[in-house]
Amino acid sequence: MNEFEIDNEIEITDETELTYDLIAQLKKKYKKIWKTTLVDGTEIVWRRLNRKEYKQIMKDYEDIENRGERLMEREDAVCRAAVLFPRGEALEEIIEYMAGASSVISDDIYEKSGFRVAAPEEL
C-alpha cells in the first residue's frame, strides 16, 4: 500500500475516499483547494504551486532537449507536486492511462497559481 503523508494529520492512501471530512482537513491545511473533474468523472483535488516548487520543476527538466517531452514531464511533475487526491498509484494510473489528464490538471493548477491572474485592463 502506497501512503503519502500530506502532513502528520492527513494520510492519503490508494484506498482513501474523497469525503467531506477529508476536504475539510485539506482546506484547513492549504486554505484554498480546487477540484477538477475529468471526463470519466474522476475527481482530482489540488492546491496551488508555490514559487519554490515551480522553479524546482522548471530546473529539474531543463536538460530535456525535446520541447514537447520537456513540457509533458513538467506537467506530470506539477500534478505530482500539487494534487492532494488521489495520490500514489491511483494518481500515476491517471497520468499514465489518460493521455491528456496531466495537461488539463496542470493548466488548472497553473491558472490558480497566478499564471493567468486577470485580464489586462485599459486605463
What are these regions (language model features)?
Residues M1-K27:
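Short, basic/low-complexity N-terminal boundary segments at the transition from targeting/disordered tails
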